[in-house]
């Protein structure tokens, strides 16, 4: 699934390599063909690393671990390896199948880093070299491939055999001068070694050698290595790494239909008093920078503000523009954001006044908060809503109204995020105007995602949503002008089986740093009767 590249920024100097492919992407496993494709699709990723091993009958396969179900791969015949299924259903690919796929994906902007595992004998070493070089030559991949290995003798043989294909050593126990004298083209060392020996980076560059650091999954380490001037960074987090190296802030937002507290006799054991503490626990555990709620009543608002004092809130009751009725509120971390604008409008023909819209069964509102990061000055225009559960015309017209409002907000490249209980699956045609305006669904367009139901009905499937495939997936995020990193439905246990009749959903994303916002006028931008 392609990464969501919604803002075109200036890329960092370092090339990002997806370690064993982007195996954290939806439906992927380490060294699989899905992970290879996901690495190519990941925003900012410039290369993919894979691991090659020989079977007992000299078939080259792409797999990291030597052991497979308790048996060494080099003691297994290929037909035994081929029977194995990964959790996503993929078989372990042959190097031939992997290279066929890589040939279609690799170009001047995306490179294959082909790790050859250490040989168990000199004879096997020769077989490795012959097969790997012949494989690259046959697929005309010499200009898009780099061989890497912990086996120094293997590196020497490769360098002598194919001087036109770069070779880098992984072992970390040789200086650049020593490797250069052996004809080896680069150092590909664990990041901790390069941080201990930063002089090796300069030495390698002076000798015309490349420098790659592996496996870097920490922002601070990545930024240190970037400042030291490494050429490549291998990581398990290629999309997140791009944001770190661009020095973009990463945010975590939650959308949550909290289930209003007004029906304790109907909710029984799931009534608000029995789950309110677990709602707070969920927020504390997940630590969002901001979260939008649906269905919140005043007593729930007061409870959350009391027990989550680190958050401030914007939003009004839908029935009078003050306290009455459900509130589509936005909570935000006071230490991270300031509010540049807050705005509530009604989903109706008269959006600036308290009103019903079209054939809706309830008044429906949208809360807008223009948030500015206090440190970076980046801005996010965040919209939160709850579409009607009955009125089909109301849902369709509400989306059109939202698109008009959000297109105005996004005109200057401002990142715009919409969350809410939409009472519709993404297959519903009501969302077509959002897609056409390039407000894209993060559930579908984020590399790390899921397709979990978001409506749980306290464990009972509701007849209202049971007729269509995916129809219980009704809580969504849409976005424009940002990089999406991860989407997740929070189905974990926070103290009771269900903290609401909906599961929260969470998205992580980055935005371009330094997008300035202007302070609003002091009067409220929320209009009411």
Model segments located where?
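Acidic/histidine-rich helix-loop elements
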Residues: 21-24, 78-84, 255-277, 323, ...
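Phosphate-group recognition and catalysis centered on beta-loop-alpha active-site segments
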Residues: 12-269, 282-286
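Active-site-proximal beta-strand elements of phosphoester/diester hydrolases
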Residues: 17-19, 250-265, 328, 340-345, ...
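Active-site beta-strand/loop signature of hydrolases that rely on acidic residues for catalysis
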Residues: 252-258, 279-304, 331, 369, ...
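N-terminal, active-site-proximal structural segment of metallo-dependent hydrolase catalytic domains
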Residues: 227, 246-307, 318-326, 512-523, ...
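Bacterial Sec-dependent N-terminal signal peptides
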Residues: 1-15, 524-529
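Metal-dependent phosphoester-hydrolase catalytic domains
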Residues: 336, 393, 397, 404-416, ...
